[in-house]
């Protein structure tokens, strides 16, 4: 059995692969449709439009994967360097390089991230843009050349090895076991050497002698891929589940097997499903003594049936059906396990949070030795985490601890972070950025009991000289006070649902000149990730971190809903009476955030903010 730490690493690796592939699944679907329609054996053959097929699978798709991989490691700079490195992989070989892209992209991101860390603080003022551009260009060039020279020989060696393995099994009359080599080779686009070097010559010879050949269907059987896609349709989640239906049509009826490759690449355990499906399919063909009279191209069920002799129809259909069934069962098992693992992780986080609330210390005080800084992180580092950090900072100050408490976006967490607090739905993502930090999960950033217990543990550890009372404010403390005016306060509102409330807050931010109209859409995108309801009747809708370019200047609008607005359908007590729309350029809005968290200590203040019809009272409380 894998240890808990090993399981987390496997899960994180799987999520990383998925995050490289899934943003680009639309491009795979587009390529699949173009291929199925316009190639010579497609539904609408078109010589001109068919020219799109080769460049898209050779260049576009690997570049997109490399770009996404680099971006996951080091943002936009990592994406650019990752794409440059991937170009070296593409040119270094004559087959589509998905696997190479999944290596080159993150490598490019890692390289530029290491350089940026080394260069931090060493660049003279005024030379930042010059150094940034040239560093990414030079590092990208070096990696592209390196991958160009390395990838060709590596691919050739791997292809030769797979072909040799198949040849040994064929000569030993162990045909079903050839799928152990064939299915992984298909996923990596290394099947040409097997097809053209072994299966085609043997298939032609056997077909001339017996009128059919099993070798024509070992690689072309659509069953294994069909099983995986059906498993995603039923047990998948997110974009993978939503797109699997269209991919199934392209794969099974269009014969474009490449369309299911990304679904396996992002979850490598599914290789076992397609291998088992392939083995069972070939075994069925041997059992029924079935085969095709000629190669089926493309490998759709229609082309397969057209190449099937009358006496082999039952065997071929049984082969496809059994291969699909076996692949489906095994893929479903792995996808269900993945869901359960994620669910168990969430349950553990929730249990930990409840333990904190009840006063149970689930981390020994010794673990806090040396902690000097605490990060409260959320997706954008703007609203939710700012509130939590403000509340925790106040408690740390009252305890006399010399510990800095700051909020930030998860993507901005430093590698050397010691202690990180996130919403339970974002903890796994935070762990990817800072795997060596202590991570705490909560489901309410305004959970005072959580912070009380944490501060108590920190105090017991004596992490700092208690004689030195120092509450460190965020490094980017505002230079000028943020001004909240009566034009930014809206009282006595009503909304049928949270969407209305969020849109109202967003439109007021636009009207006040704080943001561009596109920021409103980003507020809805942020809400889809994790609810911005904080608890205590307060919600702080704001945009995603990608939407910061749409922020013209820092602004806050306070919207009061005396009758309340339900923010989480599955939580009865998630009724927000204060909906505070936030757009932050820097940290000027923290003044209002701090005032709100201070008001939480006073039940009368929260009641007044939620019910008063006097704007001046609201301003007085939030300016306190």
From Swiss-Prot:
A Gene Ontology BP annotation from the UniProt entry: phosphoenolpyruvate-dependent sugar phosphotransferase system
Residues annotated with Phosphocysteine modification: 378
Transmembrane domains' residue ranges: 25-46, 51-71, 135-156, 166-186, 274-293, 314-335
Single GO cellular component term: plasma membrane
Protein location: Cell inner membrane
Catalytic residues, chain numbering: 378, 542
Signal sequence segment: none
Segments forming domain PTS EIIB type-2: 372-463
Post-translational modification comment from the UniProt entry: An intramolecular phosphotransfer takes places between His-542 and Cys-378.
Listed InterPro entries: PTrfase/Anion_transptr, PTS_EIIA_type-2_dom, PTS_EIIB-like_sf, PTS_EIIB_2, PTS_EIIB_2/3, PTS_EIIB_mannitol, PTS_EIIC, PTS_EIIC_2
Induction details: Induced by mannitol. Repressed by MltR.
Residues the record lists as Phosphohistidine modifications: 542
EC id: 2.7.1.197
Record key words, sorted: Cell inner membrane, Cell membrane, Kinase, Membrane, Phosphoprotein, Phosphotransferase system, Sugar transport, Transferase, Transmembrane, Transmembrane helix, Transport
Membrane topology note: Multi-pass membrane protein
Keyword Transmembrane found: yes
Top enzyme category: transferase
The keyword Transport is annotated on this UniProt entry: yes
CDD domains, sorted: PTS_IIA_fru (cd00211), PTS_IIB_mannitol (cd05567)
Domain PTS EIIA type-2: from-to ranges: 482-624
Biological role: The phosphoenolpyruvate-dependent sugar phosphotransferase system (sugar PTS), a major carbohydrate active transport system, catalyzes the phosphorylation of incoming sugar substrates concomitantly with their translocation across the cell membrane. This system is involved in D-mannitol transport.
Subunit field text: Homodimer.
Domain notes: The EIIC type-2 domain forms the PTS system translocation channel and contains the specific substrate-binding site. The PTS EIIB type-2 domain is phosphorylated by phospho-EIIA on a cysteinyl residue. Then, it transfers the phosphoryl group to the sugar substrate concomitantly with the sugar uptake processed by the PTS EIIC type-2 domain.
Protein name: PTS system mannitol-specific EIICBA component
Record organism: Pasteurella multocida (strain Pm70)
């Amino acid at each position: 059995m894998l240890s808990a730490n090993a399981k987390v690493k496997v899960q994180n690796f799987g999520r990383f692969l998925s995050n490289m592939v899934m943003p680009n699944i639309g491009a795979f679907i587009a390529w699949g449709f173009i291929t199925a329609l316009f190639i010579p054996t497609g539904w609408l053959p078109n010589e001109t439009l068919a020219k799109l097929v080769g460049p898209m699978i050779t260049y576009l798709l690997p570049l997109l994967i490399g770009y996404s991989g680099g971006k996951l490691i080091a943002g936009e700079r990592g994406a650019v360097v990752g794409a440059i490195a991937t170009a070296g992989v593409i040119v270094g070989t004559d087959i589509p390089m998905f696997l190479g892209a999944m290596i080159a992209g993150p490598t490019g991101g890692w390289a530029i991230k290491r350089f940026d860390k080394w260069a931090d603080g060493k660049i003279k003022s005024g030379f930042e843009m010059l150094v940034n551009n040239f560093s990414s260009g030079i590092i990208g060039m070096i990696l592209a050349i390196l991958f160009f020279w390395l990838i060709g020989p590596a691919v050739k060696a791997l292809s030769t090895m797979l072909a040799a393995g198949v040849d040994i099994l064929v000569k030993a009359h162990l045909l079903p076991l050839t799928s152990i080599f064939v299915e992984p080779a298909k996923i990596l686009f290394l099947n040409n050497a097997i097809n053209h070097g072994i299966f085609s010559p043997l298939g032609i010879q056997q077909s001339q002698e017996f009128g059919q050949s099993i070798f024509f269907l070992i690689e072309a059987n659509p069953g294994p891929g069909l099983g995986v896609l059906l498993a995603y349709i039923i047990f998948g989640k997110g974009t993978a589940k939503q797109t699997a239906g269209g991919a199934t049509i392209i794969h099974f009826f269009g014969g474009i097997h490449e369309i299911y490759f990304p679904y396996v690449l992002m979850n490598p355990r599914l290789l076992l499903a397609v291998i088992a499906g392939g083995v069972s399919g070939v075994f069925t063909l041997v059992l029924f003594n079935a085969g095709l009279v000629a190669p089926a191209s493309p490998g759709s069920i229609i082309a397969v049936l057209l190449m099937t002799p009358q006496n082999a129809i039952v065997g071929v259909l049984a082969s496809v059906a059994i291969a699909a069934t076996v692949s489906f069962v095994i893929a479903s098992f792995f996808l269900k396990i993945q869901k359960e693992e994620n669910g168990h992780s969430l349950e553990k986080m929730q249990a930990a949070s409840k333990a904190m609330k009840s006063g149970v210390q689930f981390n020994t005080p010794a673990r806090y030795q040396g902690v000097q800084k605490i990060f409260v992180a959320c997706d954008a580092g703007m609203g939710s985490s700012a509130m939590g950090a403000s509340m925790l900072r106040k408690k740390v100050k009252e305890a006399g601890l010399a510990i800095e408490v700051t909020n930030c976006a998860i993507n901005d967490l430093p590698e050397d972070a010691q202690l990180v607090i996130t919403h339970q739905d974002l903890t796994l993502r935070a762990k990817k950025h800072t795997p060596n930090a202590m991570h705490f999960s909560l489901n309410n950033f305004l959970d005072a009991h959580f912070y009380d217990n944490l501060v108590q543990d920190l105090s017991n550890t004596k992490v700092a000289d208690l004689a030195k009372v120092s509450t460190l404010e965020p490094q980017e403390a505002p230079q000028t006070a943020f001004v909240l005016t009566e034009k930014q306060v809206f009282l006595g509102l009503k909304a049928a649902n949270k969407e209305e409330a969020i849109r109202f807050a967003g439109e007021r931010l636009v009207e006040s000149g704080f943001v561009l109209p596109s920021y409103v859409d980003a507020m809805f995108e942020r809400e889809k990730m994790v609810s911005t309801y904080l608890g205590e009747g307060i919600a702080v809708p704001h945009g995603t971190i990608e939407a910061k370019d749409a922020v013209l200047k820092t602004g806050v609008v306070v919207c009061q809903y005396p009758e309340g607005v339900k923010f989480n359908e599955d939580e009865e007590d998630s009724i927000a009476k204060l909906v505070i729309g936030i757009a932050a350029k820097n940290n000027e809005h923290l003044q209002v955030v701090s005032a709100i968290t201070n008001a939480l200590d006073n039940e009368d203040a929260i009641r007044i903010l939620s019910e008063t019809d006097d704007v001046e009272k609201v301003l007085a409380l939030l300016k306190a």
